[in-house]
Structure formats: structure tokens, C-alpha cells
């Protein structure tokens, strides 16, 4: 049974009802509807921590979806799953791919910055300050891009940039 037909909490039920109504009234092709159904099912599985199921749905949505903007969100969510699984190299790849299709995803820039910052901290623990600085510099660049897109957000990142004198 498709996940979208599974009953859940009130928010999930409401989202499913609204999504189904929109799919009926907005002129879309059957392929677009099917892609959205897989995307919605992927989001549902992801929110429950069922990452393998979510990835299957997202890959199927990617196969069907042709709109670059919509594909960017599918790729972003795949990146989130890889981040959650500690697969940072894969996550960065998917965030990059999402940004290629939609350069206005501050959350992708933020997540890339967080991964780079984490790798910088790992390098410090391993005693490699030169590599750490390179990772921190890269994190700073990504955070600057996220902040440029949404100036009121990412306050902690803004503070880190100021404290480390990386904010221009």
C-alpha cells in the first residue's frame, strides 16, 4: 500500500488531504502526479526515520520528475538522509546537485557549512591545524552564501564568522 494512504497523526493526515486535493485541481501530467506521490511518500518515511524507504521513494521521484526546481528539493532531501547517516561526502554531493538546479536553497549551503565545520573539528582532533583551517574557511564561504540568501537566519553561524574574523 502506498505510504500516502497510511493513516498517521493529524498533521500527516492533513498534509495528505491537502496534497491530494491540490493534485486533483492543479493541472499536472500523470508523471508529475506520480513523482509528487513518491516525493510525499519519501518525506513521510524520512520523518519516521525510515531512510531506506525514503531513499527508494526519492530515487523513483527523481526518475519521474523533470522540473529542475522540484528535483532540487528531492536531491536536498537525499542529502539530508546521507547527512543523518554520517555519509558526509555523499551528502555534499547531493547538496551540490540540488544547488546546481536551484541556487536559492540557503538550507543546502548551511548543511554544507555544518559538514565542513565538523570536518574542521575532526582535523583539529587529529592535530592537523592546516587542514582544519581549510575546512573552516570552506564552511565560512558556505555560511556566507546561506546568510546572503536569508540575512535574518543562521545567527549562530553569523556569530561564529564574527568571532573567527571570517565575516566581511
Swiss-Prot record:
Repeat region (TPR), residues: 35-68, 72-105, 120-153
Domain of life: Eukaryota
SUPFAM superfamilies found in the cross-reference section: TPR-like (SSF48452)
GO cellular component: chloroplast thylakoid membrane
Primary localization class, coarse: plastid
Keywords: Chloroplast, Membrane, Photosynthesis, Plastid, Repeat, Thylakoid, TPR repeat
Pfam families: TPR_1
InterPro entries: PSI_Ycf3_assembly, TPR-like_helical_dom_sf, TPR_rpt, Ycf3/AcsC/BcsC/TPR_MFPF
Membrane topology listed for this record: Peripheral membrane protein
Entry's localization field: Plastid, Chloroplast thylakoid membrane
GO biological process per UniProt: photosystem I assembly
Function of the molecule: Essential for the assembly of the photosystem I (PSI) complex. May act as a chaperone-like factor to guide the assembly of the PSI subunits.
HAMAP family: Ycf3 (MF_00439)
NCBIfam families (UniProt xref): PRK02603.1 (NF002725)
Family annotation (PANTHER family): CELLULOSE SYNTHASE OPERON PROTEIN C, TPR REPEAT-CONTAINING PROTEIN MJ0263
Family assignment from sequence similarity: Belongs to the Ycf3 family.
Protein name listed in UniProt: Photosystem I assembly protein Ycf3
The organism of origin for this protein: Populus trichocarpa (Western balsam poplar)
Name of the gene this protein is made from: ycf3
Amino acid at each position: 500500500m502506498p505510504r500516502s494512504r497510511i493513516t498517521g497523526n493529524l498533521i500527516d493526515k492533513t498534509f495528505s488531504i491537502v496534497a491530494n486535493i491540490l493534485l486533483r485541481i492543479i493541472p499536472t501530467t500523470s508523471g508529475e502526479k506520480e513523482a509528487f506521490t513518491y516525493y510525499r511518500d519519501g518525506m513521510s518515511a524520512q520523518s519516521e526515520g525510515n531512510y531506506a524507504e525514503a531513499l527508494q521513494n526519492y530515487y523513483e521521484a527523481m526518475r519521474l520528475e523533470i522540473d529542475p526546481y522540484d528535483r532540487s528539493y528531492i536531491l536536498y532531501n537525499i542529502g539530508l538522509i546521507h547527512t543523518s547517516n554520517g555519509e558526509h561526502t555523499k551528502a555534499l554531493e547531493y547538496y551540490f546537485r540540488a544547488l546546481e538546479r536551484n541556487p536559492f536553497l540557503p538550507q543546502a549551503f548551511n548543511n554544507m557549512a555544518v559538514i565542513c565545520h565538523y570536518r574542521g573539528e575532526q582535523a583539529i582532533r587529529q592535530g592537523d591545524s592546516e587542514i582544519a583551517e581549510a575546512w573552516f574557511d570552506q564552511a565560512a564561504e558556505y555560511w556566507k552564501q546561506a546568510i546572503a540568501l536569508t540575512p535574518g537566519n543562521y545567527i549562530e553561524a553569523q556569530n561564529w564568522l564574527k568571532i573567527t574574523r571570517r565575516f566581511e
